[in-house]
Amino acid sequence: MNDWYESTRADYASKGLGSRSGYGIKPALLIVDFSNGFTDSTSPLGGDFDRQVAVTARLLTVFRDGQLPVVFTTVAYEPDFRDAGVFIKKVPSLSILLQGSHLVEIDDRIAPLKGESVIVNK
């Protein structure tokens, strides 16, 4: 695998691709899909993510104390799934993630504060 990686990096470099842009001057915290549907162990899609939620809560405290941007994402579908595209056919178990249900809300242990964005992805 290392040979593949090195050859890919060399190919990218020869084409002027793969440069780094740095970290910028204002970091943001993006919390992806820490909704009840995934973090609640009683959910059909859930697991034991207590440790991950606890670590995320610590990160949230740091970002909020520093007044840095925090953005959450969740997966949510309309009841008729017209917004689901073909992905719902690939992963039909996601059909329990309906807009307005408890399962698509962000876990209360890291709940968004007023002004923090929640992006619904499909």
Task: Show the residue positions of the predicted features.
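Active-site acidic carboxylates
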Residues: 1-117
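Alpha-helical scaffold elements lining the catalytic groove of polysaccharide deacetylases
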Residues: 120-122
